[in-house]
Amino acid sequence: MNHIQNAMNQAAELIRKAYDTAVAEGLLPEAEVRPVQIEIPKDLRNGDYASGFAMQNAKVLRQNPRKVAEILVEKMDLTGTCFASAEIAGPGFLNLRLSHSWFENVLTNITEEGENYGRTAAEKPEKIMVEFVSANPTGPMHMGNARGGVLGDCLAEVLHRAGNEVTREFYVNDAGNQIDKFASSLDARYRQIILGEDAVEFPENGYHGNDIKVLAQKFFEKNGDSYLNRPEKERHEALAAFGLENNIPAMKADLQRYLINYDVWFFESELHNSDYVADTVKKLTENGHTYEKDGALWLNTSYLLEQMYRAEGKSSEDIEKLELKDDVLRRANGFYTYFAADIAYHRNKFEVRGFDRVINIWCADHHGHVARLKCALDALGLDGTNRLEIVLMQLVQLVRAGQPVRMSKRTGNAIALHDLLDEVSVDAARFFFNSRHSASPIEFDLGLAVRNDSENPVYYVQYAHARNKSILKALAQDNIPTDVKTADLSLLVESAELDLIRDLSRLPEEIRLAAVQRDPSRLNRYATQVATAFHKFYTECRIKDAAPALREARILLSCCTAAVIENALSCFGVSAPDHM
């Protein structure tokens, strides 16, 4: 149950009904008033919920705003609602205070729903695909993949808990230029093993990582020099296939270690082998959006983008400054470009597999590709403008002792995901990478991530849970029942208790907002706030030494807190240990 939304809806309905009653009784004139807006005040001493309705509509009601507020408060009927009182503040703010029964209902609801607390039913559930990481299978995954993995996985989880049908997908780029470059790099290293490094020139734009040397050595150990004198095309195909056979399982293993499990691994080669790329380009041509030039087939991207920008209200002058260009779909040599395959892939998502919405997690340096892909899908009649969302993600900077870290101590290469997980826990990695909005860069402090104190944010939250569990365990060892399902919750009146319950009530709304805003980092901040509220409760409210009825109520509150922290952490794949 979403307690925040329910309370806000009740507050809005109370004010609207009070206005209608005042109009019916001739106390206020009938007018086109603005909709009732409800907010949560920063200072809860002013009330739990507030509205500026009286001030916003004073002009059309031809009354002093405070007078309008007085009339509305007088006509409010709080019977059967979650509110105990309505008050006026300042020039005409309407402040509503929650009744104690609301706080009691929150704890009852958490107790009843348990691990399902926080999940809600979407008003309009969608079939959504979240595609993320999709790293080239030509080498180890880097820090951008590490951040994108957590971002995509957590976003998929909150979308699911908010009531949508969600599919996690990894797109394997096993065709095209990068695979050609992968094959030529492996080929050079393979021949260097046999003929010597000086005898074989390494391609200037090849992959220079040590992993290429390792793969080439494995290929040599398996095949010897049997491929040395075979045709280059045959050798490249064998090397690329061998490399992918080794790299893709390694990528899957790293991601599973990182607690990321995909529903679908989709291979680019399937689009080419089934002629789906060719068919997609054919449809674009039939729709009048391509032309031939210099032996290549082009998409009239500049025209499509211009139409899209005009629809958004951009002026001709602004559009001209963008220097829009067209894109090649099929090269003069007959091969299709990556862009053509990408259009076909997204057409498959919508047209073949029937997703209502597709969300891609991309690094911010791909921003120039967003509008081009959307307008290409529009040209296919798939409404890419509205149905395709791209979440752009900023870079990650690893630091240790305040200094940037770029190389692995073990391998001497750029730090890969598996290197990171050798140094810090999966919990720490997932927490840190989900700690900020995707549009903000992340500074990942390796030293901080391994500290076992409250300075480490993941430790701080997990310790609150472990501390809570240890309290309950100690009580049970003293023969005090801790499996409490009901208690006299009216006894919970201390500010630390009520503040904690307020925070516990927010989980369903935080999950909803994380889904709507495409920002799962909200859950990190929320879990930290609950941990802080629990530490305050533990400091100010004794449990063991309290009177039996109050002790029972506080035990139930502690159990609810444990459930909420565990549920919140599970949204972004972090464990909630019972002891630390």
At which residue positions do the language-model features occur?
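Non-catalytic interaction-recognition regions
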Residues: N2-E104, E115-M580
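Short, charged, solvent-exposed linker or helix-capping segments at domain edges/interfaces
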Residues: N105-I110
